[in-house]
């Protein structure tokens, strides 16, 4: 039954569909609990510099980002990192290997959104706990001399984790988003933009042009206060070919992508995603992408 209104009554128009609002722990608190060590900082810095050189043609090694789809378990992540660290050291002359440490999952509809959003995988959504666990994992992996890569989904989470990230991705669902382009323009690490889920390359090229430029957007300070962030632009951005309606890792697709990038006045810098549309979401096909 509806509520009767009188000419003098004022209807409530604020937060009508909000069930609850909880305070988020400030980044500075998490930094005090999990301060960056010299070893972790050196790992991140060295990897960023190596990737910068690769992107600008000063290092002929290949950049490889490898790891699980997303992190869901601390022990499993540490075991994987220990094994990968040995491989990274073994192949360091030819490859710059980063571990894929993804804590957030963009969803087409609904589903588990990642370790930060729901660290216990039980729909309790203990985000403060998830943020702390994410930083702990990044710190410990970097201390194995293994640099980390992740996907950025919002403008707040990076204030808790970005100092431990050597390379970042903007996903196919968010490459066209103005907010994510603005965020990329201020990130301290190199950033890859994926082509659209339908294979559209133009949105990734436009994203790079945008991220190269300065922007102003809303985020939070390390003290947790809402703030206006002004960026300088990020010169270390590139395209990621991830497939779409059809794979786009073949020579013709790569040549077409390079031509479109060059047409926009940008350096033709590409990464190929072995998964997603390029492997038709069948993990056994990933090595076929690699071999091509």
Predicted regions and their residues:
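A contiguous, surface-oriented mixed alpha/beta subdomain in the mid-to-C-terminal portion of proteins
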Residues: 238-244, 256-271
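Short, contiguous, helix-prone interaction/anchoring segments in small proteins
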Residues: 59-65
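Glycine-rich, N-terminal phosphate-binding loop and its surrounding beta-alpha-beta segment
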Residues: 61, 73-101, 107-111, 115
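Acidic (Asp/Glu)-rich catalytic clusters
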Residues: 55-58, 85-92, 136-145, 230-231, ...
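Active-site-facing alpha/beta catalytic cores
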Residues: 2-4, 8-15, 94-249, 253-254, ...
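Conserved, mostly hydrophobic/aromatic
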Residues: 67, 272
């Amino acid at each position: 039954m509806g509520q009767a209104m009188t000419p003098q009554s004022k209807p409530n128009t604020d937060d009508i569909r909000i069930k609850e609002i909880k305070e988020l722990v400030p980044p500075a608190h998490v930094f005090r609990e999990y301060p960056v060590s010299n070893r972790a900082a050196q790992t991140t810095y060295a990897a960023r510099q190596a990737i910068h050189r690769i992107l600008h043609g000063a290092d002929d090694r290949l950049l490889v980002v490898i790891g699980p789809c997303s992190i869901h378990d601390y022990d499993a992540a540490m075991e994987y990192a220990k094994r990968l660290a040995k491989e990274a050291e073994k192949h360091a002359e030819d490859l710059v290997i980063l571990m894929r440490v993804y804590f957030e999952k963009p969803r087409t509809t609904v589903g588990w959104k990642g370790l930060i959003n729901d660290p216990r995988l039980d729909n309790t959504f203990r985000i403060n706990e998830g943020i702390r666990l994410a930083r702990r994992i990044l710190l410990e992996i970097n201390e194995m001399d293994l640099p980390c890569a992740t996907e950025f989904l919002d403008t707040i989470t990076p204030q808790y984790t970005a100092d431990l990230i050597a390379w970042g991705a903007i996903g196919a669902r968010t490459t066209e988003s103005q907010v994510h382009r603005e965020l990329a323009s201020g990130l301290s690490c190199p950033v890859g933009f994926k082509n659209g889920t339908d294979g559209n390359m133009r949105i990734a090229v436009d994203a790079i042009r945008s991220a190269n430029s300065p922007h102003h957007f809303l985020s939070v300070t390390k003290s947790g206060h809402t703030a206006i962030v002004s960026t300088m632009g990020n010169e270390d951005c590139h395209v990621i070919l991830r497939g779409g309606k059809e794979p786009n890792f073949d020579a013709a697709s790569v040549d077409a992508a390079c031509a479109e990038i060059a047409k926009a006045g940008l350096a033709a810098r590409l990464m190929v995603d072995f998964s997603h549309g390029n492997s038709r979401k069948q993990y056994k096909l990933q090595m076929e992408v690699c071999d091509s």
